[in-house]
UniProtKB/Swiss-Prot annotation:
Residues the entry annotates as binding pyridoxal 5'-phosphate: W101, T143, D166, Q189, N243, T244
Protein family membership: Belongs to the class-V pyridoxal-phosphate-dependent aminotransferase family. SerC subfamily.
Localization in the cell: Cytoplasm
The reaction(s) this protein catalyses: O-phospho-L-serine + 2-oxoglutarate = 3-phosphooxypyruvate + L-glutamate; 4-(phosphooxy)-L-threonine + 2-oxoglutarate = (R)-3-hydroxy-2-oxo-4-phosphooxybutanoate + L-glutamate
N6-(pyridoxal phosphate)lysine PTM positions: K190
Ranges that cross the membrane: none
EC number: 2.6.1.52
Stored Gene3D superfamilies: Aspartate Aminotransferase, domain 1, Type I PLP-dependent aspartate aminotransferase-like (Major domain)
EC class (word): transferase
InterPro entries membership: Pser_aminoTfrase, Pser_aminoTfrase_methanosarc, PyrdxlP-dep_Trfase, PyrdxlP-dep_Trfase_major, PyrdxlP-dep_Trfase_small
Annotated protein name in UniProt: Phosphoserine aminotransferase
GO molecular function, one term: pyridoxal phosphate binding
HAMAP family associated with the record: SerC_aminotrans_5
Length: 370
């Protein structure tokens, strides 16, 4: 029987992700429109975004946070190009974005002393093979495969190389041991549903030391430069961005952080995300035609949740189109490079009731197209 209720918000995209419940464009009226980002009010707004982010995540006091251009991609690229090359590199690959980082390191930077550990979709490489005398590059959560690292236990507290982690679909949704990460990047448009084009960069003291003691052999474009005269450009981490940010997008980020504070902060964001995943765990347990792409529960993502469905690719496309036409689910097809299936965002801005409702519609559509 066709469901009678529909999700209040049918946006289940894995990026840009759904706006938080109660979102209003009116919340952005305090943005310093028409003012320079280097003016006092402009810089204060950017510094506020940095401080609220730091406080929400509970970062170590000696870690630095900055706003940088070009989303998570820009943030991570600037670190790869600025920091790698002075020692060997181990890269972990198990989905599209981690594969792109490996391509950058081996084909663009052409670092010969590089080991790539690759696993197919749904699996993780063997983490025990990683050598922390090398710099280690990995994603915390594979956004296109629905597979995450189980925890940080495989990373030693004492290590010679740096750990560079793309955590864009993990921050604000998963427990992350920051002291095990030297570089951590993310974008605004993932777990908290902010706007695109801006990245955030978090550096440990060890990462700063690398920047100040090592100069790559290749030229760096302006938007990748984190140092001036061999010293860290600390102004970047105080609200003085490398180039012009969108003050509207920054105001939107402030609004999302205020919402996150209002629902109980980081602990509650993680709980909301886990409760959302539990909806699908119950749904998969009840239906033998839908399966998690992640092979085991301990590596199953709680944000970008990926599924295999017992349908042909043609029938699956029909199911996805049907749900879109009914205006109950947008953008839930698997990533273009991933195995055919569904990918449904379960981060903190998604309401559990909407996912429960979506499950009814998926079941209805499956019965029609199978």
């Amino acid at each position: 029987m066709k469901p009678t209720r529909v999700p209040k918000n049918p946006c289940f995209s894995s990026g840009p992700c759904a706006k938080h419940p109660g979102y209003s464009i009116e919340d952005l009226n305090d943005a310093p429109f028409g003012r320079s980002h280097r003016s006092k009010p402009g810089k204060e707004k950017l510094a506020e975004a940095i401080k609220r982010t730091r406080d929400m995540l509970g970062l170590p006091s000696d870690y630095l946070v900055g706003i940088v251009p070009a989303s998570d991609t820009g943030a991570f690229e600037m670190c790869l190009w600025s920091m790698l090359g002075c020692r060997g590199v181990d890269v972990l690959v198990w989905e599209s974005f981690s594969k792109e980082w490996a391509t950058d390191i081996t084909k663009q930077l052409k670092l010969k002393d590089t080991r790539v550990f690759e696993a197919e979709y749904g699996k993780l490489p063997d983490l025990e093979n990683v050598d922390f005398k090398n710099d280690v590059v990995f994603v915390w959560n594979g956004t296109t495969s629905g597979v995450k690292v189980p925890n940080g236990d495989w990373i030693p507290d004492s290590r010679e190389g740096l750990t560079l982690c793309d955590a864009t679909s993990a921050v604000f949704a998963m427990d992350i041991p920051y002291h095990k990460l030297d570089v951590l990047t993310f974008s605004w448009q993932k777990v908290l549903g902010g706007e695109g084009a801006h990245g955030m960069l978090i550096l440990s003291p060890r990462a700063v030391q690398r920047l100040e003691s090592y100069t790559p052999a290749w030229p760096l474009p302006k938007i990748f430069r984190l140092t001036k005269g061999g010293k860290l450009n600390k102004e970047i981490f105080e609200g003085s961005t490398i180039n012009t940010p969108s003050m509207l997008a920054n105001e939107d980020w402030l609004a999302t952080l205020k919402w996150a504070e209002s629902v109980g902060g980081l602990k509650q964001l993680i709980q909301r995300t886990n409760e959302n995943l539990a909806v699908f765990e119950a749904f998969v347990a009840k239906n033998n035609w839908i399966h998690f792409l992640a092979e085991t529960k301990e590596i199953r993502s709680s944000t970008s949740v990926c599924f295999k469905v017992d349908l042909s690719e043609e029938k699956l496309k029909e199911l996805i189109k049907m749900l879109e036409n009914e205006k109950v689910a947008y953008d839930i097809g698997s990533y273009r490079d991933a195995p055919s299936g569904l990918r449904i965002w379960c981060g903190a801005t998604i309401e559990k009731e909407d996912l429960e409702c979506l499950c009814e519609w998926i079941e209805w559509a499956y019965d029609l197209v199978k």
